[in-house]
Amino acid sequence: MNTYLKPFELTLRCLGPVFIGSGEKRTSKEYHVEGDRVYFPDMELLYADIPAHKRKSFEAFVMNTDGAQATAPLKEWVEPNAVKLDPAKHRGYEVKIGSIEPRRASRGRGGRMTRKKLTLNEIHAFIKDPLGRPYVPGSTVKGMLRSIYLQSLVHKRTAQPVRVPGHQTREHRQYGERFERKELRKSGRPNTRPQDAVNDLFQAIRVTDSPALRTSDLLICQKMDMNVHGKPDGLPLFRECLAPGTSISHRVVVDTSPTARGGWREGERFLETLAETAASVNQARYAEYRAMYPGVNAIVGPIVYLGGGAGYRSKTFVTDQDDMAKVLDAQFGKVVKHVDKTRELRVSPLVLKRTKIDNICYEMGQCELSIRRAE
């Protein structure tokens, strides 16, 4: 191998469920629930198995997205039409369902406090390869590494909270883009402008996709918010996630040639000390925040957050709580006034992103990182 290229082996062990979405949603007409498991048949094979004279009826059932029929489960058509779901014929795969938490208590008729029970609806699918096997894209992990690097710079340079001028989403984005350009667009390649993406130091880092995982590594997880009073709120959003305990591996290669040739000499040191850097970011960014939530134990060490549903704090380098609240108000202010609540509770974001599996709470996206030099 070229002596400029330094390979590493990165491993992420899921402590909580990890969601990397494919952009697809599976409706209740595309799966069958049996106890605590969901069976996703191959819909093409299922359709081919339906007698020809019943196919128009099935098509009408699947395509009907109005009224009560919009959320009708698959069994409402297959059972009365004597079509037996058979994994041997219809292939597909089966996934366990995590615990489903009711909505937070609200006042109902007669002034009584009640919690609305929820059932599965649309399920956001995990990304899969052409053979239907889940995997984690290298681009997702590279984005996580980029966030860790920028967050570590922020926490090393100042003990004061990082402020963002203005409070609109656009202003926050522009400030973030300027910060990234200043810290990362340093290659200075010939015949380019300083702000060009080709001058980004992270161009020198390549991350492979993970090896294919198994569908048995997946779990259906509900989005659940927990406030600082320890009260959970189950939301009607469900995702296919990698289950806690799953290990994900990636090969990471850094080009240490001169920056003008697209390399990043200091990138080798960044990867060598990545576990220590992740641990310091975890301590600076999450320790005090997580301590605000009752029953949430502090976890020290190289803890990182990967994928969707992990919360705003994992996606930004801003540390000032009031500024976080302003940005969140700009995005979601019609629902909750984050600024007012942050001043009252002294925490932002206002909820911890969690889910339940067998009635045990987990944080979304939480992983333990390890890295070593590779051959």
From Swiss-Prot:
Recorded coiled-coil stretches: none
Role: CRISPR (clustered regularly interspaced short palindromic repeat) is an adaptive immune system that provides protection against mobile genetic elements (viruses, transposable elements and conjugative plasmids). CRISPR clusters contain spacers, sequences complementary to antecedent mobile elements, and target invading nucleic acids. CRISPR clusters are transcribed and processed into CRISPR RNA (crRNA).
PANTHER family according to UniProt: CRISPR SYSTEM CMS PROTEIN CSM5
Keyword RNA-binding attached: yes
An MF annotation (GO) of this entry: RNA binding
Quaternary structure (record): Part of the Csm effector complex that includes Cas10, Csm2, Csm3, Csm4 and Csm5.
Any single biological process term in GO: defense response to virus
Disruption phenotype: Deletion of the entire CRISPR-Cas locus (cas6 to cas2, Rv2824c to Rv2816c) decreases resistance to plasmids encoding spacer elements about 6-fold.
Cleaved signal peptide residues: none
Record region (Disordered): 167-195
Protein name: CRISPR system Cms protein Csm5
Keyword RNA-binding: yes
Note: Encoded in a type III-A CRISPR locus.
Domain of life: Bacteria
NCBIfam families for this protein: cas_TM1807_csm5
Segments crossing the lipid bilayer: none
Keyword list, A-Z: Antiviral defense, RNA-binding
GO-annotated cellular components: cytosol; plasma membrane
